């Protein structure tokens, strides 16, 4: 059995939305609102209903425990889709249901994701004027290192697009690759302005090395 500790905001939001929808606390809609608020408070853009569907949940609110069985995924989605406060994003409803991926969003977070997707598509479609010497520059940057071919490819790709996503596990050379990208960009344009951001203190420390 999974246990979730709710804060007063989660509970108040769920009760307020249940009241607006004309349903009683304890319904599957009520539990979904609890969970999507809990997910947002913990840094998630949405609630993946598949992570909870068909499970027995224990909600802890101010020390009071409540055990609730949640519906199976298909039934849960049907119940949410029929609720007047849940839409598909075309109307201004408090919640947005993504039927295809079984995800429930607070409308504001759904808008954030749409805006980010639009920005990514725009950036990825943009064509850059690539320097004819860029390939030689990348080889020079990695000449005295034990870098992998993938790192060199990532560096070169970063110079060819306005959007480049680099992934890898610990110790795979992501930071080294980023340093090489910056060196390449600065070599091409010493006046370029580079802004670095990091999601965690550890990542920030690595970026400063």
Describe the residue ranges of each PLM region.
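Conserved ATP-binding/catalytic motifs of P-loop helicase motor domains
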Residues: 1-208
């Amino acid at each position: 059995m999974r246990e979730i500790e709710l804060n007063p905001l989660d509970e108040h939001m769920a009760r307020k939305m249940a009241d607006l929808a004309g349903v009683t606390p304890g319904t599957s809609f009520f539990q979904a609102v609890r969970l999507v608020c809990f997910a947002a408070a913990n840094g998630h853009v949405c609630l993946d209903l598949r992570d909870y569907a068909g499970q027995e949940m224990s909600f802890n609110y101010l020390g009071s425990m409540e055990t609730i069985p949640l519906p199976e995924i298909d039934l849960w989605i049907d119940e949410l889709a029929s609720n007047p406060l849940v839409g598909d994003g075309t109307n201004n409803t408090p919640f947005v249901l993504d039927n295809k991926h079984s995800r429930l969003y607070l409308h504001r977070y759904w808008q954030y994701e749409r805006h980010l997707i639009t920005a990514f598509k725009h950036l990825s479609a943009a064509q850059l004027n690539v320097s004819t010497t860029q390939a030689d520059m990348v080889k020079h940057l990695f000449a005295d290192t034990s870098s992998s071919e993938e790192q060199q490819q990532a560096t070169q790709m970063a110079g060819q697009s306005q959007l480049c996503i680099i992934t890898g596990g610990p110790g795979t050379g992501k930071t080294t690759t980023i340093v090489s990208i910056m060196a390449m960009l600065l070599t091409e344009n010493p006046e370029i302005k580079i802004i670095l951001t990091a999601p965690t203190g550890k990542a920030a420390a690595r970026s400063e090395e």
